[in-house]
UniProtKB/Swiss-Prot annotation:
It comes from Lymantria dispar multicapsid nuclear polyhedrosis virus (LdMNPV). This is Polyhedrin. Major component of the virus occlusion bodies, which are large proteinaceous structures (polyhedra), that protect the virus from the outside environment for extended periods until they are ingested by insect larvae. Pfam families: Polyhedrin. InterPro entries: Polyhedrin. The gene is PH.
Length: 245
């Protein structure tokens, strides 16, 4: 006779698993990858231990060398909202012979051997009216095709914010440095040759646009300068001078 009250003990068993013996599969894979990454990172660090003897400036502008500033021009510009105005295009006002001659005479003495390590284009921007609440923005191109005529005004598209009212660009080409040591002699020989064959053969000639985040037309003061990073060598002079030597 079939018993309706038959009960299998196996149907009522409950199994309790302790979580400390089980891990999520994703966690196991992530930990394995993390451990492998740490091991590779330690190997890479050990391969660079010999570089700990050297010091490198976080910002090359403040690194070794002497900074010589050449102010090209100061101007006041009106900038309309949502637009940026061309401020540097090397059309001629950047190359006033009197300004360059005074700079060369003061910065590059004849008796010293000096080498240009880098050139920075710095643009200092300030509002002419007080209590104006907006930020300065800028864009630049290091190089362009020969014969390219840049537009005077462009729309603002993904600009860079100007920090501390100063926009600074390194103009050094790949490899950097200027191969000519006696810059004073190269300049006095020919002004045009110095610019074309010494400066622009080794450094970029950029175009720069500046604008504001203001919704109104703003009047801004621009100061455009070139900062030469100079490596200076001791002059060839005897250690002792005088009648006893």
């Amino acid at each position: 006779m079939h018993n309706f009250y038959n009960y299998s003990p196996a149907l009522g068993k409950t199994y309790v698993y302790e979580n400390k013996y089980y891990k999520n599969l994703g966690t196991v894979i992530k930990q394995a990858k993390r451990q492998k990454h740490l091991e590779q990172h330690e190997i890479e660090e050990r391969s660079l231990d010999h570089l700990d003897r050297y010091l490198v400036a976080e910002d090359p502008f403040y690194g070794p060398g002497k900074n010589q500033k050449l102010t090209l021009f100061k101007e006041i510009r009106n900038v309309k909202p949502d637009t940026m105005k061309l401020v540097v295009n090397w059309s001629g006002k950047e190359f006033l012979r009197e300004t360059w001659t005074r700079f060369m005479e003061d910065s590059f003495p004849i008796v010293n051997d000096q080498e240009v390590m880098d050139i920075y284009l710095t643009i200092n921007v300030r509002p002419t009216r007080p209590n104006r609440c907006y930020k300065f923005v800028a864009q630049h191109a290091l190089r362009c095709d020969e014969g390219y005529v840049p537009h005077e005004v462009i729309r603002i598209v993904e600009p860079s914010t100007v920090e501390n009212n100063e926009y600074r660009i390194s103009l050094a080409k790949r490899g950097g440095g200027c191969p000519i040591r006696n810059l004073h002699s190269a300049y006095t020989t020919s002004f045009e040759h110095f610019l074309n064959s010494v400066i622009w053969d080794n450094f970029y000639k950029p175009i720069v646009y500046v604008g504001t985040t203001s919704a109104e037309e703003e009047e801004i003061l621009l100061e455009v300068s070139l900062v030469f990073k100079i490596k200076e060598f001791a002059p060839d002079a005897p250690l002792f001078q005088g009648p006893a030597y």
